[in-house]
Amino acid sequence: MTRLTVSVTTEKMRLSKPFRISGYVFEAFDVVVVTLGDGQYQGRGEAGGVYYLGDDTAHMLSVLDKALDAIAAGPTREELRSILPPGGARNAVDCALWELEAARAGIPVWQLAGQAAPKPLRTTFTLGADEPALMAETARGYAQARSIKIKLTGELDLDLARVAAVRAARPDAWLGVDGNQGFVAGQLDALIAGLLAQDVGLLEQPLARGREADLDGLRSPIPLAGDESILSLADVAPSVGRYNVVNIKLDKCGGLTEGLLMAQEARRLGLGVMVGNMGGSSLAMGPSFVLGQVCDIVDLDGPIFLANDRRPGVEYVDGNVWSGPEVWGGKA
């Protein structure tokens, strides 16, 4: 087994303007970049961690530092799942291992994953929570978007006004909403009724993680997606009967390897599959784009919020996202 060189760096990603969700306002965020090399080839992975779990750069660096020798030993991607827990640190290393393995084999990652040649994916464009008129203006500005995701804050009347304003501005677009854990069970009936009136196609994570039992018996005509409730593979099966869609994010689950396993398990259980992101540059979107090839809903718009993305970067055309092999994952 060839020992690997392991480079771990941090970078600050600044947003072009503040971005608000339920309970948080983001102006910038830090990422960890892991580069693995064998003297001839290298692989890269970027992770932003999971802010609501305390999985920030300091935590990721600590996790990586404790496992550096095991990582340098050149584990397989499956072995890595036993070395590092789910989270940003494993995500960065796992994605680097994928790119390194593909480079060694002389094939792109999608081929290594057993997929057909990738296609552009229709992605959502996200609206941060703001005043309804401002959100409507932003929605009109997303001229190419065919799918829009609206961030809500748990303020029921204001949230429904936000959705109504966006729907009036974009009657042509598919709309989904994301509660980011901001609602309580007693609000759900009124929330769902209001969303139905605006032809909303997805309700994501309305209740807090840990309150999943409050969804028992709920019969929502709008599909419910679990995000914070479904972190890794172990959370997929318990979501049956409560959620209809699993939102997979590589920073949560620990990389493309686990993400693909989650998608496979969700399909086996009759659940829909969504790929999302915790923000990040195009380097973080590349692996998620591979996962997106097997998903029903794609939310990979993170780079559009950055003041400066990496180059080469993912492309957004006609409401679709495209991540070429030059961004991450090897030669075509």
Region locations from a protein language model:
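Active-site cofactor/co-catalyst pockets and adjacent glycine-rich loops in catalytic enzymes
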Residues: 303
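Catalytic core of soluble alpha/beta enzymes
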Residues: 150, 155-293, 307-319
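Short helix/strand-capping turn motifs
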Residues: 296-299
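N-terminal capping/lid subdomain adjacent to the active-site entrance of alpha/beta enzymes
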Residues: 1-175, 182-186, 193-196, 310-332
